[in-house]
């Protein structure tokens, strides 16, 4: 079975991490700050902060940067108010996009997103036009070059997971949102994950040829180049030669 679209995109982009490290860190710091501001600075009692910090660690963000972002969040309003916006959109060939943003200027972000979509052959949808194609699940990813598949499956099943998907040397453990923290804590006693969060997962994925898929990937990357765009979730089945 093929891998989850979101992780495939993240994995594919890891080779270019150094070139975009500052931009990635900017997005992560913003997410950590907002999470701490909303739910407090305790990673154990703030699930959103825990996920944000985990992402930062996977991206090799220095511990000092993470701590500063948390302190900034719990320090209160410092004159900049951020808004969370999720745009629902269509890329070419009917690919659905969920564009998650954190912005201090809604008009600017809306204009930027619309412009990139239009130039890439996509369009903004109405609320509800795309979101019904996705559902929330806990997603934990392991590198099978580091661990044995059977070992991960044994422990994951013992933890009570919903599903395990294996492809391209990765094992993707799927849980219900409610069981995510429990399962992750159990698996952490044995394995170190590559990625872990409660994510939007597509009900069905769209398969395209390499040329078409490259066009969609380019559009997603252009959207994610904006600091205001935290991530773009999609239902594209990424061809193996592009993963």
Curated annotation (Swiss-Prot):
InterPro entries: Integrase-like_N, TACO1_YebC-like_2nd/3rd_dom, TACO1_YebC_N, Transcrip_reg_TACO1-like, Transcrip_reg_TACO1-like_dom3, YebC-like
Protein's UniProt keywords contain Glycoprotein: no
GO BP: regulation of DNA-templated transcription
Keyword flag Methyltransferase: no
Transmembrane segments: none
A molecular-function term among this protein's GO annotations: DNA binding
Alphabetically ordered keywords of this record: Cytoplasm, DNA-binding, Transcription, Transcription regulation
Gene Ontology CC: cytosol
Localization, UniProt: Cytoplasm
First-listed, main subcellular location of the protein, grouped into a coarse class: cytoplasm
Protein family according to the UniProt entry: Belongs to the TACO1 family.
PANTHER family documented for this protein: TRANSCRIPTIONAL REGULATORY PROTEIN YEBC-RELATED, TRANSLATIONAL ACTIVATOR OF CYTOCHROME C OXIDASE 1
Name of this chain's protein: Probable transcriptional regulatory protein BG0025
């Amino acid at each position: 079975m093929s891998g989850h679209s979101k992780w495939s995109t993240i994995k594919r982009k890891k080779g270019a991490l150094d070139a975009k490290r500052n931009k990635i860190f900017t997005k992560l710091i913003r997410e950590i700050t907002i999470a701490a501001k909303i739910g407090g600075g305790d990673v154990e009692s703030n699930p959103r902060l825990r996920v944000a910090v985990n992402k930062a660690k996977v991206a090799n963000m220095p511990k000092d940067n993470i701590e500063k972002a948390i302190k900034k969040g719990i320090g209160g309003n410092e004159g900049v108010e951020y808004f969370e916006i999720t745009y629902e959109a269509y890329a070419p060939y009917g690919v659905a996009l969920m564009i998650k943003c954190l912005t201090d200027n809604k008009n600017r972000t809306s204009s930027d997103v619309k412009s990139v979509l239009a130039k890439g052959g996509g369009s903004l949808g109405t609320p509800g036009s795309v979101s019904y194609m996705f559902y929330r699940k806990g997603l934990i990813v392991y590198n099978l070059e580091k661990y044995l598949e059977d070992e991960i499956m044994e422990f994951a099943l013992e933890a009570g997971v919903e599903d395990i998907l294996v492809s391209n040397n990765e094992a993707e453990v799927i849980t219900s949102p409610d069981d995510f923290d429990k399962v992750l804590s159990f698996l952490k006693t044995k394995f170190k994950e590559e990625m872990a969060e409660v994510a939007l997962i597509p009900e069905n994925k769209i398969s395209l040829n390499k040329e078409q898929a490259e066009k969609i990937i380019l559009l997603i990357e252009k959207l994610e180049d904006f600091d205001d765009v935290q991530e773009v979730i999609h239902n594209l089945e990424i061809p193996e030669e592009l993963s």
